[in-house]
Amino acid sequence: MIAIYPGSFDPVTLGHLDIIERSVPLFERVIVAVLCNPHKNPLFTVEKRIEQISYCTKHLKNVEIDSFSGLTVEYARLKGAKVLLRGLRVLSDFEKELQMAHTNKTLWEGIETVFLATTKEYSFLSSSVVKEIAQFGGSVTHLVPENVSRDIYSYYS
């Protein structure tokens, strides 16, 4: 079975990688799908985010990195995936993600959403938190992969 793990991943965090690595044994293939959202002003280009994630997941043989725009369920259908993978940190994530799962189901009956609870050490972590810390000169080396922290420091220098 193929699973899609969609997100902006701007930047990819250790929490994202935790979800990816824990999903690998559960599915034949995991596609990490980087969203191209024209309404957001990203820190990194889609191409750079794909490069960052590819570097971090190169040891995972059944992980593929791609990008998409538009509806996630349409992308999943195009890729032959029946599962959307989502990480949950806190209760408010669950409320938002459950609503989205129900919405996606109305768009395509063939899609299921699988939730993975974030490992406790990453329960506070988000890309927004990383960007805010970095913007004010704080260290993010314990929050993102090494290659990503270098890119972040380069961006803010």
UniProtKB/Swiss-Prot annotation:
Q: Which GO terms describe its cellular component?
A: cytoplasm
CDD domains xref list = PPAT
Name the chemical reaction catalysed here: (R)-4'-phosphopantetheine + ATP + H(+) = 3'-dephospho-CoA + diphosphate
Query: What does the UniProt entry say about where the protein is found?
Result: Cytoplasm
Residues at which ATP binds: 8-9, 16, 87-89, 97, 122-128
Signal peptide residues on this chain, from the entry's feature table: none
Q: Does the keyword Chloroplast apply?
A: no
EC numbers for this chain = 2.7.7.3
User: What would you give as a GO molecular function for this chain, any one?
Assistant: pantetheine-phosphate adenylyltransferase activity
SUPFAM superfamilies attached here? Nucleotidylyl transferase (SSF52374)
Cofactor(s) it depends on: Mg(2+)
Site positions for Transition state stabilizer = 16
What is an example of a Pfam family matching this protein?
A: CTP_transf_like
Tell me yes or no: is Zinc among this UniProt entry's keywords: no
Annotated substrate binding lies at 8, 40, 72, 86
User: What pathway does the annotation place this protein in?
Assistant: Cofactor biosynthesis; coenzyme A biosynthesis; CoA from (R)-pantothenate: step 4/5
Q: What are the alphabetically sorted keywords of the record?
A: ATP-binding, Coenzyme A biosynthesis, Cytoplasm, Magnesium, Nucleotide-binding, Nucleotidyltransferase, Transferase
Q: How does it assemble?
A: Homohexamer.
The record's family statement is: Belongs to the bacterial CoaD family.
Function recorded in the entry: Reversibly transfers an adenylyl group from ATP to 4'-phosphopantetheine, yielding dephospho-CoA (dPCoA) and pyrophosphate.
Q: By its UniProt entry, which NCBIfam families does this protein fall under?
A: coaD_prev_kdtB, cyt_tran_rel
What is the protein name for this chain? Phosphopantetheine adenylyltransferase
- The species this protein was found in: Microcystis aeruginosa (strain NIES-843 / IAM M-2473)
Q: Which gene encodes it?
A: coaD
